[in-house]
Amino acid sequence: MTSRTRGALLAVLLAVLATGCGISPSGPARAGAPASGVQRPGDEDRSVRLYFSGPYGIRAVTRPVARPLTPEQALDLLLEGPTRAEKERGLTSEVPPMEGLLTVTATTGAVDLVVPGTVGTGELDVTAISQLACTAAHADVPGDRPATEVDIRVHEDLTRSREPWTVRCGPEGDAVPVMR
C-alpha cells in the first residue's frame, strides 16, 4: 500500500468517524416535560400501604390519604377489602369479616392486635395474619421505627389474658415470627 493510498484511506476513515459522532448540526434537541411521579424533597408522603393477597403472594397497594393513618385506621381500610381496580389486578383479601371485632392498640414501636378466632384453624390463616401485620406495621406507629422493626403482638380469641405471639412484617410482606 502506497503512502498516497494510505492517506486517502485515512481521510475517508476520518470522514466516516466524524459523521457518526452524534453531533447534530441543528443544535440542542428539546427534552420534553420534567420527570413526574417522584416525590419532591420535603413533601410529606400522604399515602397508606395496605396488603392484599394476589396470584403470586402478598402484594402491597398504596392509596392516597389526607393525613397519616393510625394502625387502627389503616386496618379499617384493609377490612373494607380491595377496590374495584385492585380486584381487577387479581387482588383479594384472606382476612375474614371482623368489623367491630378487631381491636388495635398502638404503642411505641409496637401494635397489639386482638383478633377473633385462632390462627391455623380455618378461622384465620397465615396470609390473613400477614395482611393484618404488614398493614399495621406500615401505618403511623409511634416511635418512628422502620416497618420491618415494628412488633405486632397477636392476641387470639378476643382475649388479652393469653400470652400474645409476636411477628414483624418481612421485606416481602409476610409475617415473620419474632423469637425471644
What spans do the regions from the language model cover?
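Bimodal "functional hotspot" detector
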Residues: 1-180
